[in-house]
Structure formats: structure tokens, C-alpha cells
């Protein structure tokens, strides 16, 4: 059994400037996006679609705004609205952690829609382009959560070799759920989606596969994460994260069905 090391959330201090691990993870996420995007624009079917290196930097600006604003608003509205409405100044303290992926997902969709409209591109093509770069960024975010000792897992069997005590919660062995989500929702999903997107696919197929894979992976890994709150419906209990993942699964299936529908003869 392990004990969470509870590291200092501040990675480095330069005078009055405190550089936090959580911020560094987001910086790493944006850096990997640029790196993978530059690889992706060299793929023949992407190059034929007219994607250029200049598009990446411009798109990243919109994406960063979408992730930060959408992710924070999602955390506020989906998970703990009563706390944030009682302490409104806490909403702006992003460096403390607390970002919702589902909120960030909606924020990026809106930001990319605005960017696509300004560039004269179809927003579905934009989403197909960026989707394979998202999972690794998500993995870095979950590593930031782990360093901050956020999102503790559900109670685990003490015989589990990687069970972990989170001193900021209690003295019970728990699943290291942020690491599960970094590996499954992040790394594994990246590998599957990147391989899928290497070949030319119909419009909406890559974006639809992303929604289906992420929704399914998140629904599964939520079983190991201590829920923020649970929803009871028709004798079934699911977590808030699972509830928010169901629409993504449905959306992904619908997008894939539309993308691969047979053209009329």
C-alpha cells in the first residue's frame, strides 16, 4: 500500500511568482497539442485539406480560452454550484485546480465554432482535426489533479498493490483514480484515436469516435473515483461524471452512424 506524498502544489518560486504544478501540466498539455498538430498536418489526407502550420497557433489561442473558461464554468455549474455561488471570488482562482472536462469540451466546441466561422471552415472538419490531440492533454490535466491530491478514488481493498491512502481525506486505502483516468481516458484513448485518425475518414467520424471513446472510458473509470455527487434514477445510481458522459456516448454513436451512412445510389 502507498501513501500519497502530498507534494507542495508550488513547483517553483521566482521571487513573488509561484509556478504551480497544475499550471505546468496545462502548459505541457498545450505544448503537446502543438507538437502533435504539426505531425498531423503532414499526414497526406490532412495536407490535402489545406491545413497549415499557421492555423495551429491561431487555433490554439481560441482553444486555450475555451478550455479555461469552459472548464472552470463547468466545474462551477456541474459539480459544486452552491459553494462557488457562496464564494464567487473562488471562481477566478483557477490555479487552485478544479476544472471540468465536460465544461472544457463544450468551451472548446464553442471556441472552435467561432474560429471555423472566421476561417471559412466547416466546424466538423475542425473537430475531426483536433480530436486526436485532446486525450494526451487530458492525461496531463489528470496528473495535475493527482499532484494536487484532488479527485481521490473510492475505497479499495487493502491487498491491492497500488492502493493509496490520501492523508487529506482519511486513512483508508483508495484507488488512485486520477492515474486510472490519465492512463485509460488519456493515454489509451490517444493511442486508439490516433491510429483511427491516421487514415482518411468521413466527415464527423474522428470527432464521433472521440465522443464515443471518451464517454465510454470516463463512464468506466468513474466507478473507481469518489463521486462529487450521485444521481438516482429508476433504481440506478450513477455519478455526476457518468451522467455527463452518457450524452457524449449517444452523440458519438449518432455522429458515427451519420458519417458512415450509405450514400443513396
UniProtKB/Swiss-Prot annotation:
**UniProt-recorded Gene Ontology molecular function terms:** phosphatidylglycerol-prolipoprotein diacylglyceryl transferase activity
UniProt membrane topology term: Multi-pass membrane protein
Q: Does the keyword Transmembrane helix apply?
A: yes
Membrane spanning stretches: 17-37, 59-79, 94-114, 123-143, 177-197, 204-224, 238-258
InterPro entries cross-referenced by the UniProt entry: Lgt
What does the UniProt entry say about where the protein is found?
A: Cell inner membrane
Q: Which PROSITE patterns does the record associate with it?
A: LGT
Q: What is the protein's major site of localization?
A: membrane
Q: What keywords appear on the UniProt entry?
A: Cell inner membrane, Cell membrane, Membrane, Transferase, Transmembrane, Transmembrane helix
Tell me a GO cellular component: plasma membrane
**One GO BP:** lipoprotein biosynthetic process
Residues that hold a 1,2-diacyl-sn-glycero-3-phospho-(1'-sn-glycerol) according to the record:
142
Q: What is its EC number?
A: 2.5.1.145
Coiled-coil residues are none
Annotated metabolic or biological route of this protein: Protein modification; lipoprotein biosynthesis (diacylglyceryl transfer)
Q: What role is this protein assigned?
A: Catalyzes the transfer of the diacylglyceryl group from phosphatidylglycerol to the sulfhydryl group of the N-terminal cysteine of a prolipoprotein, the first step in the formation of mature lipoproteins.
- Tell me which family the UniProt entry assigns to this protein: Belongs to the Lgt family.
Name assigned to this protein: Phosphatidylglycerol--prolipoprotein diacylglyceryl transferase
Gene name?
A: lgt
